[in-house]
């Protein structure tokens, strides 16, 4: 119950205080302050007497009395001053506030700090009692204008000044005084008031005072002024007008550039600590500085990246920037205006680096003018070209309005004799073609006119632009080109002119562009090709990337503007006698067989039946390349068009050239042979180099059998080349996909039913192939899939032992194998002497399964294949802990935008704990008290910091394999011994401690401990199920940093854990989470109208969701996206086995009322499709889906590019594999971005 003081009691205290000596006053003040702690109100009659007696007490030389008044009395007395009427507060501001402001200059910190706190209290009371009047109603002296509404009620004889303005006037007097400490403390008071009152306290009146303090003679004042300005103007809630006014004042009052640069960078960048280049504060832009410089003088800015960032505060600030530049671009360029022109161009580039074109795009585009590229001086023209290259990249389609005006100007520059300017200008044209979306008529007319020019340099650049245009725009602009009268004829005429050009370099580039033209307009291209003479047509066919035997220049050259003579170099052609080539192949095969016998003596060999020839090798062609709207996009296109060969049907019209084999390792044998090599590197990759893994087999010799068509040979076979990243590139012909899966549960080894798919290929005369499964294999596949549909729980079966522990290969070449068995490149020791490819008989292969091996089949990109027990491979070679957390993994996670707040917080907490880190690694008993506190559930911040530092200073390396030396094993045992008896206690204690209801600071530090454990002690982690439960429990938090931490941690666990084991754990944790957080009852459950039911599920505003619903959606989204990431690391057989369970998860999520959950369900379905590449099989996992839902799922597959291609449009094997890897990478990024939407930001 609050205490009350009567008027008589307060008057008695006041009387004692007036009559007492200074020492006695200290006791009275302190006692009265204690009485006021529980008092809510004082009698109004005693307020003014105390306010009048306070100034002498505050100015008293008695230090103890002064300290008592400031610390023990004022914090409790001032809040009791009544706000209404305001006469008491006005008296306090007139009497007490000046005395308090004087004490800001006191040398003792306890004095000036307490005085500052009292001033803040008076300011808060002033703003609460009388909100400030808008500045428009005040005159220059601070008094009310005569016509304002408030002045009509005020006393006409004495203008009325509001309480906030009275408080501000006194504080400004202090800031404009001479005492440096008063200024410093006054700015601190100002910062506190702004943080408390927010927008109610205007900034404009303070900016002039603060700018003056930036140039104060005292260094302490200047430093505090910088910090104050940054703290006041950097928050996002600060109005842009205040920042713009501040920039104007910096220039108007000539603040030093070093001071202004630092402040502007910190205020406007949003991440000033990460900036290495200060902003350009060109306050003298309007002055004709350097007008007398001679033409030979080189300006300071001459490099593409030597541009300082320019930060723009508001659209009005941007308009002023452009307005100050306009006078320099009026009229012709002269000796007087070329230097300001260059500075203006560089400044515009700096604005783009500061993202002004993104924040204020409309104002930026309105300010752009087209006369900046007309300069003929080298540096100025070069800067103009840099700007014109960056503008389309940054603005994209918003730059379309300038394209038609700029292309003729840049086209003229392509004929300049100054090679540097010509190259830069045409690089800008390439950027415009790549990133803008204007009508193709503009580009085609510009390119066609360039091809008609007499200058060979212009023609060379024009055909490069023609190639770029066809790569970027031909596919999607085909209808526009054909619908525009005469446009397709103009394009055709341009090709005819360029193919007949007198310059060989122009003709060479045109031939490369022609085949892209041929893909889009095949009939017109055929007519054009048939009209050429024999020699020209022969050269054109030789440039066809589908038939060229050696890599041609890639389409990446379209974005470069090299010299025209660079295209004159022709690929060397070599001929070799057929007999010599065959003899060399036989010799290489024999040597490889001997080497394989010596290396793998006693090991089983898997020998497949011979495979007939398949279509020849061709180079990858860019088909249907989408137009990119960014530099990243064009880089992706260039990568797609790299000269790495892939296999696809060869047109029958082109002849296959014979090429010699450069090395014995690349010689192919008539038989597909798979040899398991015992090597220390076998667990990761074979000893083949990446170049060999990517190298294509050479084109076959002419047919030796009448039954084989042109380009087919009995020497054609299937070889498996292990790539450097663990992926296998399978040759053409009959392809067996091994799908015998080895999975384990609680250390026991099991096998899932074998599922072997084979593609029978039937070669046609036109080079295309129809692939279908043989009836027997299709029947077996259907049986396996049907049996798996009825499984409700994960079922791990023991394989039935084969008689004699052998597998036999059938006459159709069906070889059972497992993804966990290493398949290395090699050839057989003895080859059948047969030229027709018919081999009778069977090879019996012995294969003993290793009962201790553990491996979940991964997808081709991420799997490390295991061999059988005949190869001496240690158990648990590919366990959930085969690889440690590498710096590359951590760096890749830190670069993601979605969890930036967590990484900043983690670094901040690690830096705070660094003083506790000992110089040498501490012994294990040093953290025993900290572990005990953690187990009790009540650790302090220091306990958690010490545990985190101990984890980082005692890392444990991955468990060494049997092939590694004893020293590595001893080092592992020593590192592991440190954690004996400690690790389980730390891990379990941390996971149990991490609960959303914990203190935020302790919870964040606990997350740091968990990250240190995963990063440095991952080989010791056994219970990932407990860890998953803990992560789902943290999804109940509403703190964005905690949620971001769980997102980043699960992304890391997907990379380093066994995906099958993690998938089971995530499923279990998701079920547990959804059981704890059931879905709210749906009001539309009984609604028979499907349209009304669908509309009722739409959430028009996220603010309408209850906290329980937001928590459920956050965890649900987290689980679905995590499962999707695991799916992308699994192989097709495992997905087939787990499909029904995954389908049940998808179906439940698709029917969820939340749109974000439905979106996550479709993303999970897309992840499954990325692995299976069969939409029918994918949709069969969710049989309960309606036809409309299935159609929507297929639509999403097509839009995301994961829908399989059939018939004539089906990609070749190697090209398809490359595309599938890209699909998985893109889908992983999409899932990570979708997961970030579950972060609740309040």
UniProtKB/Swiss-Prot annotation:
User: What are the recorded Gene Ontology BP terms?
Assistant: cell division; mitotic spindle assembly
For molecular function, the Gene Ontology terms on record are: microtubule binding
* Entry's localization field: Cytoplasm, Cytoskeleton; Nucleus; Cytoplasm, Cytoskeleton, Spindle
Compositionally biased residues, Low complexity: 138-156, 548-567, 640-660, 701-711, 1082-1104
Cite the residue spans of the region called Disordered: 138-161, 538-612, 637-711, 748-839, 853-884, 1077-1111
- Give the Pfam families listed for this entry: CLASP_N (PF12348)
Compositionally skewed regions (Polar residues) per UniProt: 802-815, 824-837, 856-871
What UniProt keywords apply to this chain's record, in alphabetical order?
Answer: Cell cycle, Cell division, Cytoplasm, Cytoskeleton, Microtubule, Mitosis, Nucleus
Skewed-composition ranges (Basic and acidic residues): 574-593, 748-767
**GO cellular component term of the entry, any:** mitotic spindle midzone
- On the tree of life, the source organism's domain of life is Eukaryota
Q: What is its main location?
A: cytoplasm
Decide whether keyword Cell cycle is in the record: yes
Q: Which Gene3D superfamilies match?
A: Leucine-rich Repeat Variant
Q: Does the keyword Cell cycle apply?
A: yes
What is the protein's known function? Microtubule binding protein that promotes the stabilization of dynamic microtubules. Required for mitotic spindle formation.
- Tell me its family: Belongs to the CLASP family.
Note the subunit structure: Interacts with microtubules.
What is this protein called in UniProt? Protein STU1
Give the species this sequence originates from.
Cryptococcus neoformans var. neoformans serotype D (strain B-3501A) (Filobasidiella neoformans)
């Amino acid at each position: 119950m609050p205490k009350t003081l009567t008027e008589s009691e307060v008057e008695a205290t006041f009387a004692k205080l007036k009559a007492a000596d200074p020492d006695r006053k200290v006791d009275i003040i302190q006692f009265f302050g204690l009485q006021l702690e529980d008092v809510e109100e004082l009698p109004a009659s005693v307020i003014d007497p105390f306010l009048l007696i306070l100034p002498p007490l505050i100015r008293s030389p008695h230090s103890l009395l002064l300290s008592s008044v400031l610390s023990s009395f004022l914090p409790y007395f001032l809040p009791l001053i009544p706000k209404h009427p305001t006469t008491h507060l006005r008296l306090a501001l007139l009497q007490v506030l000046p005395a308090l402001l004087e004490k800001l200059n006191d040398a003792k910190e306890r004095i000036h700090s307490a005085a500052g706190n009292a001033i803040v209290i008076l300011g808060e009371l002033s703003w609460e009692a009388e909100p400030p009047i808008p500045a428009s109603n005040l005159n220059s002296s601070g008094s009310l204008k005569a016509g304002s509404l408030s002045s009509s009620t005020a006393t006409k004889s004495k203008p009325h000044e509001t309480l906030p303005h009275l408080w501000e006037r006194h504080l400004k007097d202090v800031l404009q005084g001479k005492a440096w400490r008063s200024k410093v403390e006054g700015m601190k008071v100002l910062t506190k008031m702004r943080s408390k009152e927010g927008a109610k306290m205007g900034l404009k009146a303070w900016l002039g005072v603060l700018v003056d303090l930036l140039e104060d003679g005292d260094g302490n004042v200047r430093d505090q002024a910088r910090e104050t300005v940054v703290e006041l103007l950097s928050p996002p809630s600060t109005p842009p007008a205040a920042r713009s006014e501040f920039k104007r004042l910096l220039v108007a009052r000539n603040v030093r550039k070093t001071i202004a640069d630092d402040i502007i960078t910190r205020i406007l960048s949003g991440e000033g600590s990460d900036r290495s280049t200060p902003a350009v504060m060109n306050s003298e832009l309007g002055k004709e500085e350097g007008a007398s410089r001679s033409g030979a003088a080189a300006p300071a800015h001459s490099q593409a990246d030597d541009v300082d960032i320019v930060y723009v505060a508001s659209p009005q600030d941007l308009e002023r920037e452009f307005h100050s530049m306009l006078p320099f671009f009026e009229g012709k360029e002269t000796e007087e205006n070329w230097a300001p022109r260059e500075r203006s161009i560089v400044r515009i580039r700096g604005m783009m680096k500061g993202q002004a074109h993104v924040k204020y795009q409309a104002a930026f585009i309105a300010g752009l003018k087209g006369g900046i590229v007309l300069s003929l001086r080298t540096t100025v023209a070069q800067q103009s070209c840099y700007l014109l290259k960056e503008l389309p990249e940054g603005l994209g389609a918003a730059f379309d309005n300038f394209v038609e005006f700029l292309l003729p100007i840049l086209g003229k520059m392509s004929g300049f004799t100054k090679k540097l300017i010509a190259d830069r200008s045409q690089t800008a044209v390439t950027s415009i073609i790549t990133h803008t979306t204007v009508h193709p008529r503009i580009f085609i007319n510009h390119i066609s006119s360039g091809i008609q020019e007499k200058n060979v340099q212009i023609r060379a650049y024009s055909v490069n632009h023609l190639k770029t245009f066809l790569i970027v725009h031909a596919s999607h602009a085909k209808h526009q080109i054909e619908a525009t009268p005469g446009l397709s004829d103009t394009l055709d005429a341009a090709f005819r002119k360029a193919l007949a050009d007198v310059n060989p370099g122009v003709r060479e580039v045109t031939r490369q562009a022609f085949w892209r033209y041929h893909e889009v307009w095949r009939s017109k291209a055929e007519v054009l090709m048939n009209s050429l003479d024999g020699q020209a047509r022969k050269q054109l066919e030789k440039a066809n990337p589908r038939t060229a035997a050696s890599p041609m220049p890639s389409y990446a050259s379209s974005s470069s503007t090299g010299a025209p003579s660079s295209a004159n170099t022709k690929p060397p052609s070599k001929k070799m006698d057929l007999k010599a080539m065959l003899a060399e192949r036989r010799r290489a095969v024999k040597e490889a067989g001997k080497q394989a016998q010596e290396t793998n003596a006693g090991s089983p060999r898997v020998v497949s039946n011979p495979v007939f020839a398949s279509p020849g090798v061709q180079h990858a062609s860019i088909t249907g390349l989408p137009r990119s709207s960014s530099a990243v996009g064009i880089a992706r296109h260039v990568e797609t068009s790299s000269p790495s060969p892939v296999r696809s049907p060869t047109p029958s019209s082109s002849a296959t050239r014979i090429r010699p084999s450069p090395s014995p390792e690349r010689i192919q044998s008539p038989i597909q042979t798979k040899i398991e090599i015992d090597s220390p590197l076998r667990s990761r990759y074979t000893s083949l180099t990446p170049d060999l893994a990517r190298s294509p087999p050479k084109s076959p010799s002419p047919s030796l059998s009448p039954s084989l068509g042109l380009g087919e040979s009995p020497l054609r076979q299937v070889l498996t080349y292990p790539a450097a990243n663990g992926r296998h590139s399978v040759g053409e012909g009959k392809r067996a996909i091994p799908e015998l899966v080895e999975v384990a549960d609680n250390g026991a080894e099991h096998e899932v039913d074998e599922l072997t798919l084979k593609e029978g290929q039937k070669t046609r005369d036109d080079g295309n192939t129809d692939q279908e499964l043989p009836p027997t294999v299709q029947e077996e596949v259907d049986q396996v899939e049907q049996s798996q549909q009825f499984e409700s729980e994960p079922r791990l079966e023991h394989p039935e032992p084969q008689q004699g522990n052998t597998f036999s290969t059938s006459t159709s070449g069906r070889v059972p194998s497992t993804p966990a068995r290493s398949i290395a490149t090699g050839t057989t020791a003895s080859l059948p002497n047969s030229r027709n490819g018919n081999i009778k008989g069977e090879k019996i292969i012995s294969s003993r399964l290793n009962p201790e091996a553990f491996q979940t089949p991964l997808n081709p990109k991420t799997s490390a294949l295991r061999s059988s027990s005949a190869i001496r491979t240690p158990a648990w070679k590919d366990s959930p802990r085969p690889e440690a957390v590498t710096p590359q993994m951590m760096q890749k996670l830190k670069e993601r935008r979605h969890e930036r707040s967590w990484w900043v917080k983690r670094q901040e907490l690690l830096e705070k704990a660094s003083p506790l880190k000992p110089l040498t690694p501490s012994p294990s008993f040093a953290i025993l008290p900290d572990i005990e506190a953690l187990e009790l559930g009540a650790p302090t911040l220091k306990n958690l910091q010490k545990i985190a530092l101990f984890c980082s200073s005692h890392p444990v390396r991955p468990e060494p394999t049997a092939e590694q030396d004893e020293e590595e094993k001893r080092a592992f045992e020593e590192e592991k011994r440190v954690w004996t008896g400690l690790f389980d206690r730390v891990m379990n204690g941390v996971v149990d401690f991490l609960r959303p209801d914990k203190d935020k600071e302790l919870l964040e530090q606990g997350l740091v401990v968990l990250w240190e454990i995963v990063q440095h002690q991952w080989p010791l982690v056994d219970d990932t199920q407990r860890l998953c439960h803990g992560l789902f429990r943290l999804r109940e938090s509403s703190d964005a940093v905690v949620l971001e931490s769980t997102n980043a941690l699960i992304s890391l666990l997907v990379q380093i854990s066994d995906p099958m084991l993690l998938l089971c754990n995530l499923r279990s944790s998701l079920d547990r989470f959804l059981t704890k957080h059931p879905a709210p009852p749906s009001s539309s459950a009984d609604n028979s109208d499907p349209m009304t039911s669908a509309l009722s599920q739409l959430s028009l505003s996220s603010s309408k969701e209850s906290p329980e619903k937001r928590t459920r959606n956050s965890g649900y989204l987290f689980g679905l996206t995590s499962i999707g990431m695991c799916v992308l690391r699994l192989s097709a057989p495992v997905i087939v086995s787990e499909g029904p369970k995954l389908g049940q998860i998808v179906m439940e999520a698709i029917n969820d009322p939340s749109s974000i959950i439905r979106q996550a369900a479709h993303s999970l379905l897309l992840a499954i499709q990325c692995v299976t590449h069969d939409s029918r099989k994918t949709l069969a996992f969710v049989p309960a889906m309606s036809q409309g839902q299935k159609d929507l799922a297929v639509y999403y597959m097509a839009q995301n590019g994961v829908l399989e291609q059939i018939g004539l449009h089906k990609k070749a094997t190697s090209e398809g594999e490359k595309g599938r890897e890209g699909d998985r990478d893109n889908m992983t990024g999409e899932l990570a971005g979708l997961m970030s939407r579950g972060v609740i930001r309040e």
